[in-house]
Structure formats: structure tokens, C-alpha cells
Amino acid sequence: MKKRLLAALVSGALMMSALAGCGGSAAQTNNGGDTADQTTQQDYHIKVILKTLAYEYWQYVGNGCKQAGEDLGVTVDVLGASSETAYDEQLSMIETTLSANDCDAMVVAPLQAETVATQIANTDLPIVAIDTAIDSDKVLSFVGFNNEELAAMGGKAAVEAAKKAGWDKITAIGIMGVQGDSTSEARIAGFKQGIAEAGGEYLSAETQYADSVADKAVTSMEAIIQAHPEGVAIIVANNDDMAAGAARAAAAFPAYKNTIFVGIGGNLAGIDAILAGQETMTVAVDGYDVGYLGVQAAVDALNGKKLDEFI
């Protein structure tokens, strides 16, 4: 996905924004040529299976999927697991979709990409992956972001902010999502790269995993504070909820007064946390557009259009 890179000041804190390009935002995509006219001739049924619907980011993705269905004149059902660790629940949804033979295409954001690749190996159902790529020749296209690039951008900005905040020794610790998840691991790699390039040090051995849940991020932050009573310059997190949770956990400790807390997402809760002085900055991604373009890609494939491998 081509990205527009924007920067904006929010209550004195830098909010890095990497929004989906692909010819424009979802509002612009709605007017994308002949696609809608072609689609209204068919009553396509698209099943969308997301990682979860429990978090604000995934609700944005789901809303984009539904809007694409309305604009393109197709039926879209959006499903999601109860959490980002409910692996069996999502696999069951995918298996049911594959065996039910009641839809024309499937859009999926996999929790376990390798397992899903095996699961879809023998299907003829058109499949589009979103958010997290699936290494399978059954997947027609991937709609998403380069998570390493996003995190690297946040890492670089965090180091610059830490310098301005007066930190001499700039070290960073990550509170990340699900251990082994490709998105989480890519973001760790990106944060590490961006921080190093800007002159900081990412403490890889001290990475905490909190399953993308704010409450678990609080527990992770408490462990970091216990291990580093002197303070840490930067805390990077897999999403905004976790970054804000970590900041709340550290609020009572003077050594963490100037710590830079960085998340990824840019949802309303994240922006509110920045304005409230909790989270310092976020790398904002347009989940709505990811969902919209995922459904649009599925419809284009059903209409015989050859898709780009990476949208």
C-alpha cells in the first residue's frame, strides 16, 4: 500500500501519521471508476473475518468493509474473534466459511498466518488478506501496511522527542502484542531499527508481550518500573491502548515523568490519550481504508480484474 506520510502537532506532542494512499482515502476510493457499476450487476456475498472486533482499530476496519459493501452493492458479513489470542475461534470461523459454500469471496486478517495458509490450501474461494500477509498462492492480494516502516518512523521520532525531553542515555523497551505474531514481530524490528538509526538503544532482551491488551500492558509496565527504578527514556507499544495503559502505570513515578510513550493506531482513544498527556505520540494507520480496499479487491477479483499482489 502506498502511504502518505503526514506529521501534525497534537497538544505539543508529535503525532506521526501514515495513512493509506492507493489513489486516496476511502472517500476518494468510493468514486473509483467502473467498479461499482460492474458490481451492481451481481449479488456478491463477501465474508470478512478479522482478528477481533473487540478493539477500536478493528471496528474501524470492519466499518470500512461494510461501507465498501454499501458502495459497491454487495453483501458483506464481518466477523471477528473475541480477542487477538482466540486462535481456535478464528480458525473455526474460517473453516466454517470454507465448508459452508455460502459466499463468493473471503477477506481475512489472520491471527496465525501460517496455520491459515494450510487451512486454505485446497480451496477455490477467492481470498484477500488484510493487515497481515498470508504466504499462500490462494491469496489473490494483500492490503495492508509495511509494519517495519511504520514502527521505524515512530522509533526515530521517539528518540528525537527523548533528546528534547532531556534524556542523556536514550534506551527503549517494547511492550508488544502477541509473541510470535508476524505483525508484532515486524513492529519490534521496525522500532529497533528506527531507534538505533536515531542514536538510541532498543533493549531487545527486555521486550514485554501483553497480547495487545491495555490491562496486560499495565502489568508489563509495572515490571519495567521495578527493573528500572531510574527510568527509561522510551516505551514503545504495539498499539495506542497499550501505550496509554503503560503511561498510566508510570504516572506516579517521578523517574518516568519525561518518558516518551509511543503507540501505533491513531484511533480516537489514542488521540484522546495524547491530548490528556498520557501517550506521547502515535503512528496513525487508516484501518478504515484497509477494510474498504480489502472488500473492493475481492469484488474486483470476482469481476475478473487482475489484482496487484500488494495494495
Question: What is the meaning of each model-derived region?
Answer:
Residues 5, 22-311:
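A residue-level marker of the well-folded mature domains of exported/periplasmic proteins
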Residues 14-16, 63:
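Hydrophobic alpha-helical membrane context
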Residues 17-21:
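C-terminal motif of bacterial Sec signal peptides marking the signal peptidase cleavage site
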Residues 1-12:
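Positively charged n-region of N-terminal signal peptides that target proteins for export
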